[in-house]
Amino acid sequence: MDIIFYHPTFDTQWWIEALRKAIPQARVRAWKSGDNDSADYALVWHPPVEMLAGRDLKAVFALGAGVDSILSKLQAHPEMLNPSVPLFRLEDTGMGEQMQEYAVSQVLHWFRRFDDYRIQQNSSHWQPLPEYHREDFTIGILGAGVLGSKVAQSLQTWRFPLRCWSRTRKSWPGVQSFAGREELSAFLSQCRVLINLLPNTPETVGIINQQLLEKLPDGAYLLNLARGVHVVEDDLLAALDSGKVKGAMLDVFNREPLPPENPLWQHPRVTITPHVAAITRPAEAVEYISRTIAQLEKGERVCGQVDRARGY
């Protein structure tokens, strides 16, 4: 069994050694331009077209939760990957726990009005503020996949009203489910906090725009943990300036790194993190990949395969 590996920033040698240990029967090598030798599996992140084109692969593993970089490249270069080759993504591998930590900490930050107290502190102003009531602090999750489910579970501990919206209806205990475009407005109407965990597909690009933000209650909050392309930044800035959106916590952006001149940096109601909400944990990813390859070799049914038509 031959495995090729490519990631522009990961510690390639660590991964190769870990994979060799986890899959002793495999010959694992770092792919470099010009390497056209045979391979059974490819582990990739933002792969060059030539890495995958023309190969008779058993499967490709994207080294992250999203596969939009591969799918967008396939649109321009359909020859890059045979349609019959299964494409897998890392469904969790520790990312769910990280998303839970990030989402819960920020929701509680807003619920306890720490954002308002920070602004008061900046002007040396001492003034207790009325508390928010839990039963009125509805949390809405856009996107009901593996990570959305994990975030919902973690928020249930705090007894906030929870709702989710997705392409198809879900049956999550304690979570009100909305499905399809026809139910999006009803979903948004009560969301004091909107958490975006949508996949990046042609249908979701620019979905968080003026029209969507206007359907939120006045003074709502936005937490974007998915992709920057989901948000129309000018529309979000306008909503923040008007007070329609009271605050935004943003981990992802249309351009990364976020350019220094981007007005989001200086907005008093915006908090920025550099795409760190949930990073790939190498040891857990290697365990998932090695287990999945073993299942594929046995012809067993596996989880995590991407539906290329849907984009996730």
Swiss-Prot record:
UniProt EC number: 1.1.1.79, 1.1.1.81
Catalytic residue list: 227, 275 (proton donor)
Keywords for the protein's UniProt record, in alphabetical order: Cytoplasm, NAD, NADP, Oxidoreductase
A single cellular component GO annotation: cytosol
Pfam families named in the record: 2-Hacid_dh_C
Transmembrane segments: none
The keyword NADP belongs to this UniProt entry's keyword annotation: yes
Keyword Cell membrane among UniProt keywords: no
Chief place of localization: cytoplasm
Reaction catalysed by this enzyme: glycolate + NADP(+) = glyoxylate + NADPH + H(+); (R)-glycerate + NAD(+) = 3-hydroxypyruvate + NADH + H(+); (R)-glycerate + NADP(+) = 3-hydroxypyruvate + NADPH + H(+)
Single annotated GO MF: NAD binding
Alphabetical list of InterPro entries matching this protein: D-isomer_DH_CS (IPR029753), D-isomer_DH_NAD-bd (IPR006140), GhrA_Enterobacterales (IPR023514), NAD(P)-bd_dom_sf (IPR036291)
Gene3D superfamilies the UniProt entry points to: NAD(P)-binding Rossmann-like Domain (3.40.50.720)
PROSITE patterns: D_2_HYDROXYACID_DH_3
Annotated compartments: Cytoplasm
Biological role: Catalyzes the NADPH-dependent reduction of glyoxylate and hydroxypyruvate into glycolate and glycerate, respectively.
Family indicated by similarity: Belongs to the D-isomer specific 2-hydroxyacid dehydrogenase family. GhrA subfamily.
Protein name: Glyoxylate/hydroxypyruvate reductase A
Organism, as annotated: Escherichia coli (strain 55989 / EAEC)
Name of encoding gene: ghrA
